[in-house]
């Protein structure tokens, strides 16, 4: 099989089979899988992702489209730098070596990529364009630097975005994340929050789950900002933001963030307060906050209720109010908010009901809208009416106003690492922050770099950071932070339209290809990469780089590939190839010691539950692997890797070869009858396989093709074979299977005597009239009970059906010589004879 696969891969390469032109009279179709990080090896999870994309690309080509299906490398990032530290080498060497190996692996799988458009994000000829784009953002005040409380990973020595912190730990290192103040570069994605939110409803070809995740991440909240005076210090106030200001008469406390400025200004830091602040500083984001037990510590301060000066509320530092959301302060209404209720119960704070309900709010919060009670001038109003009225009162008193907040924060793009795109800015004592002139781009990374494992190598490089200021020519310092790697992946899809463009994009090429028609990747990128790419596209549109404002018309999120995990008696993880099954138990191949099978989980390096792709290819071939990862489960669902599954796919491919040999030896028989049912099945399969591929039900498409192959095999085993239909059906099945298993189908297609390449052939057409059955079976009932079935010709009239069914022997038995009172017909399904 490997020889056949290598043969066709070479032919495709020689013929430039998948290189497409930007000038074509055909309709365009742009299919793209999320570009990979060059880790060194393609794993089976990648293969599934790329196989899905390849089926779509090849299918759309056969449908007559001009298909762009490119590939490139998201090549900056921490693993390369960590490998450099470990091996005392430059990250570039490790990265380029990995790219070479992975490219070879991708080609060996037969994916139909246009390699002439390959991009590499660590190539200065790529990132010089994003450096220029950053300067344009800076000029428009969409890029800025400020001191910010950041998530610091003490192992990787870098800042992490909130999304990169999982359960308080760094997503890569697993280290407990700390909070630090650092000067950071930000992009003003919040300027686009409203458009990003509103446009979600137009992304109709995106999964609902992703759309919902983006809506929640942007998190629009409409409410009010208003001030509480501090008791005994009325010159000072605490400003709160609330989405439910109508519950103001149920206020039980004021909750503030651990880093709220009022703490430094007015609050004595007791050991209890200091300890609590330290504890809060380890909470890294709202996702972790939601899981954390709600706690607080009293500050000693009270505020005065804005509508009743006799009511004073304690000011409490809480672990669930964040400084970067709203004002960093809220009023707590325990009766009608779950978090506030949890804290009130714990700290013995008052719980006052202000919305009508039968629920006992002392036991559980009532969080729905309703009619206001115990609320002075708001009594009897609905929640919405009360909200409008109380905000009107705030505005009359001059203590508050209507406001809108977003959960979405500006995108922190600074990373204190070497292996990333340098931020093209210079710090001058005399001139301040000075952009690098465009004529000096790209700012490249130095080759002579030392990795001692501590901090950012750019910061302690002896010469790289020392430059003259472009404005005053005095000594200055380069910015030593590099871009977050999501910067590169936020615009790469535009570069594929013409990867040799002298500017960031070739506008004409982008106008032809964009938006991407189908984007394929993991749902884990829903609120980072996909949101950032949408943001970049809007800004690029305003900078006249592209005409679209949304990058991806359709999105498909594939499931993961899973495998069982194994551990030895010392609790060490084992690779699947180190384990052998004997009966119902597992043993180590070499030591023969018992092995414990663990959970079936996502394939990962750490748990060693990986399948070596090279070994699988040598054993089964690329086509069998491709077929298996698409056939055992719907593409959007997780897939469990199984040896029996891939062996079954390998047998199916061998069966195709045997079928070809059997068909090739057939001699035309003019006396053979046409197998109408087989002919109908061929046309039925063409129609429904096309529909299945269009709707990404690839496993069902494969099942239909297997069914057709079984029907052809059954016909071949008859004494008198319908040669014409068998040959036609086999040609069709080879064409239908080509997007899934391209190598063996090209080989068989050629042996069938076809001159045109299969990848370039038209998808087979079906005849609608052939889909009609000559006959159909109806259930025959007497008084609603099934008594018989009968196969009718499609041409049978109602009268004929009634006459035939009444005279059936099994029906006559129950009629007992009586005439039917009525005969009810449900077309093509049931005849019910009423006696």
From Swiss-Prot:
This protein's record includes keyword Protein biosynthesis: yes
Locations listed in the record: Cytoplasm
Gene3D superfamilies: 2.20.28.290, 3.10.20.590, HUPs, Isoleucyl-tRNA Synthetase, Domain 1
GO cellular component, one term: cytoplasm
EC number: 6.1.1.4
Record has Nuclease as a keyword: no
Major localization listed first in the record, in broad terms: cytoplasm
Xref: InterPro entries: aa-tRNA-synth_I_CS, aa-tRNA-synth_Ia, Leu-tRNA-ligase, Leu_tRNA-synth_edit, M/V/L/I-tRNA-synth_anticd-bd, Methionyl/Leucyl_tRNA_Synth, Rossmann-like_a/b/a_fold, tRNAsynth_Ia_anticodon-bd
PANTHER family with a match to the protein in the record: LEUCINE--TRNA LIGASE, MITOCHONDRIAL, LEUCYL-TRNA SYNTHETASE
Protein name per UniProt: Leucine--tRNA ligase
Organism: Rickettsia felis (strain ATCC VR-1525 / URRWXCal2) (Rickettsia azadi)
